[in-house]
């Protein structure tokens, strides 16, 4: 009686007795191990029968390795030949995971923010399979070609609205020090009214110069026009946008402006100042807003001149939204939409204090995005009405029919 038959009978006995067949102490792992090694021996026999006729190639020992399967860990003894021409198919060279379902599960757990330690513990507990951090990393690296293809895909020629903002993380540099990295994100609304992440870009810091590179990349990938760009108050950002998309309307985030203003107002005045400021950004039109800004300055200008000056200096960019309908104003007066996306991403990345590499950061953020975008199947509420308003406003730049 050979070992394969013994393992088969053991599996059958455990099945009848109700014992576990899978994972730790299960009978299927050793049975699978026998089957795989027998198949490899058969492959080598077939390979040598062809080689020996021409070159006299012979066996040259075996190479042992551990392979993870959904039934547990198995030891594979891969035969070797003297000429090194044997290429096994049953278990390929350098293959350490023999179950696409297992690899997919690892990637899915990683995409949900599960730590490598918890992933390893789960597979050890459920399948008696030992996964090192390097193994998990190599499995999740399978998504890297997908990221490359996604980052270079062609885009639509026109987007109705785009929000541009950065999210920051800590990453180890080449010397092992934790440094800040910014991921620049461009979240857009296409002509169908659906959210779309046009791109994400890793850089050492947020700045207008790098945003210029980002916008140029969008142009190179087919974007010809963005009707409205919504941004924070980064200096030089509007100029960077209009150097690439000169017809775009640029709206500075009102919420950012308010936050920055309040920082320089004394705590005992903040409540009253905010109430007065609300009459400016909450006005019915731009003329009314300008009149209320004059009133704000007459009351608070001597006490907080720098705050008032900031509103004056950025006035045209801060008040772009007044030329649109209330429904469109609600979408563009703040970068809340992209910040909401960032909050969803952080729910996944919050378990990572410092990322070991830029690649590991980009990999996890992309996987988080891949799950988030599954919900972006429907257009914005009342998009039919909004798209008509945009078509009337922008004419030939936004044809919907």
Task: List each language-model region with its residue ranges.
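Conserved beta-strand -> loop -> alpha-helix junction used to position metal-binding or nucleic-acid-contacting
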Residues: 228-235, 240-276
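Basic, short loop/linker segments at the boundary and entry of helix-turn-helix/winged-helix-like folds
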Residues: 59-112, 128-141, 208
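Acidic/histidine-rich catalytic cores and adjacent linkers
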Residues: 246, 279-401
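RNase H-like nuclease fold core
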Residues: 79-82, 90-95, 129-133, 142-231, ...
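DNA-recognition alpha helix
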Residues: 117-128
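Metal-dependent DNA phosphodiester-chemistry modules and their immediately adjacent helices/loops
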Residues: 87, 261-289, 295
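Subset of Sec-pathway N-terminal targeting signals
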Residues: 1-15, 23-61, 65-71
């Amino acid at each position: 009686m050979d070992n394969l038959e013994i393992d088969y009978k053991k599996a059958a006995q455990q099945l009848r007795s109700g014992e576990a067949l899978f994972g730790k102490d299960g009978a299927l792992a050793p049975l699978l191990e026998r089957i795989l090694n027998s198949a490899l021996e058969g492959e080598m026999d077939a390979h040598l029968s062809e080689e020996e006729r021409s070159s006299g190639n012979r066996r040259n020992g075996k190479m042992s390795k551990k392979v993870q399967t959904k039934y547990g860990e198995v030891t594979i003894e891969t035969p070797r030949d003297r000429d090194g021409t044997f290429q096994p198919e049953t278990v390929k060279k350098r293959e350490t995971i023999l179950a696409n379902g297992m690899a997919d599960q690892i990637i899915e757990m990683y995409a949900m923010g599960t730590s490598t330690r918890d992933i390893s513990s789960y597979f050890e507990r459920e399948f008696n399979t030992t996964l090192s951090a390097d193994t998990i990393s190599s499995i999740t690296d399978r998504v890297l070609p997908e990221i490359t293809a996604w980052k270079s895909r062609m885009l639509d020629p026109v987007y109705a609205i785009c929000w541009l903002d950065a999210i920051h993380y800590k990453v180890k540099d080449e010397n092992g020090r934790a440094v800040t990295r910014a991921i620049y994100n461009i979240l857009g609304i296409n002509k169908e009214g659906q959210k779309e992440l046009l791109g994400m870009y890793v850089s050492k810091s947020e700045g207008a110069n790098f945003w210029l590179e980002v916008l140029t990349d969008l142009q190179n990938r087919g974007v010809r026009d963005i009707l409205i760009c919504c941004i924070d108050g980064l200096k030089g950002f509007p100029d960077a946008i209009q150097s690439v998309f000169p017809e775009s309307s640029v709206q500075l985030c009102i919420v950012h402006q308010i936050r920055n203003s309040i920082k320089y107002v004394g705590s005992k005045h903040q409540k009253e100042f905010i109430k007065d400021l609300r009459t400016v950004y909450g006005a019915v039109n731009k003329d009314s807003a300008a009149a209320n800004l004059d009133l704000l300055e007459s009351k608070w200008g001597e006490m907080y001149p720098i705050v008032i000056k900031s509103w004056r200096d950025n006035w045209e960019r801060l008040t772009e939204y007044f030329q649109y309908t209330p429904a469109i104003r609600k979408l563009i007066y703040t970068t809340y939409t992209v910040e909401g996306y960032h909050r969803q991403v952080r729910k996944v990345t919050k378990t990572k204090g410092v990322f070991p590499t830029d690649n590991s950061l980009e990999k996890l953020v992309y996987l988080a995005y891949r799950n988030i975008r599954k919900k972006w199947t429907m257009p914005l509420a009342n998009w039919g009405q909004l798209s008509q308003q945009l078509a009337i406003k922008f004419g030939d730049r936004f044809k919907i029919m």
